[in-house]
Design a protein with these regions (language model features):
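Charged DNA-binding/catalytic regions of mobile-element recombinases
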Residues: 1-211
């Protein structure tokens, strides 16, 4: 699939995060063109459609995509639920799910998860859901999308990359190819990537210190 701009391919997944005494779930939607996080939500359960729909609604409110956007996910029940499928239909999105013989290339998602682990999750101990929500919002909205440089984007942040792409190049003049490859292990491990006791290589992002 060749991407020529934003809001053509969104990739969604649900990792889980360890809190003090419990696990909670983080639904994230990533724009594959710019690697920008366009929607996210956290909740104590992923057994209903509430978590995933909340992330989707947030993404739609922020991006206002046109019909025809491809929404890719694994085959989890949360993304296959009637409520979530109805939400995709409501916004004219094309649902795409990984199959045993043809999972999607997870390069942009893996890159985001690695950054989230090393620069946020593994450098903090969260006491409760509200603390996690506050930290995740600050990490995504203030740092990752606006400041974090990506080698794949020419050492630009997702927002800078989007702005320069829109300003300097027509939407149909820039092509970026997303290669679909077989990698069953990525799908199997999708909900375990950001758990753990910590990592010796973890480096926190430069969160502003309170006065």
């Amino acid at each position: 699939m060749t991407l020529t701009g934003i809001n053509q391919l969104w990739v969604a997944d649900i990792p889980y995060v360890r809190l003090k005494g419990e696990f909670v779930y983080l639904a994230v939607i990533l724009d594959s063109f710019s690697r920008k996080v366009v929607g996210w939500a956290v909740d104590r359960t992923m057994m209903s459609h509430r978590l995933t729909v909340a992330a989707l609604e947030r993404a739609v409110a922020d991006r206002q995509p046109q019909a025809g956007l491809v929404h890719h996910s694994d085959r989890g029940l949360q993304y296959a639920s009637p409520e979530y499928v109805a939400a995709l239909d409501k916004y004219g999105m094309v649902a795409s799910m990984s199959r045993p013989a043809n999972p999607y290339d997870n390069a942009s998602w893996e890159s985001f998860m690695k950054t989230l682990k090393q620069e946020e999750i593994y450098t903090n101990r969260y006491n409760d859901l509200e603390q996690l929500r506050t930290n995740i919002e600050e990490f995504i909205e203030e740092y990752y999308n606006r400041q974090r440089l990506h080698s794949a984007l020419g050492y630009r942040s997702p927002e800078e990359f989007e702005q320069q792409s829109e300003r300097k190049q027509p939407a149909n003049s820039r092509g970026a190819t997303v290669q679909f490859t077989v990698n069953d292990e990525n799908e199997k491990q999708a909900s375990t990537w950001i758990t753990g006791e910590g990592d010796s290589n973890a480096v926190p992002f430069p969160r502003p210190q309170p006065f």
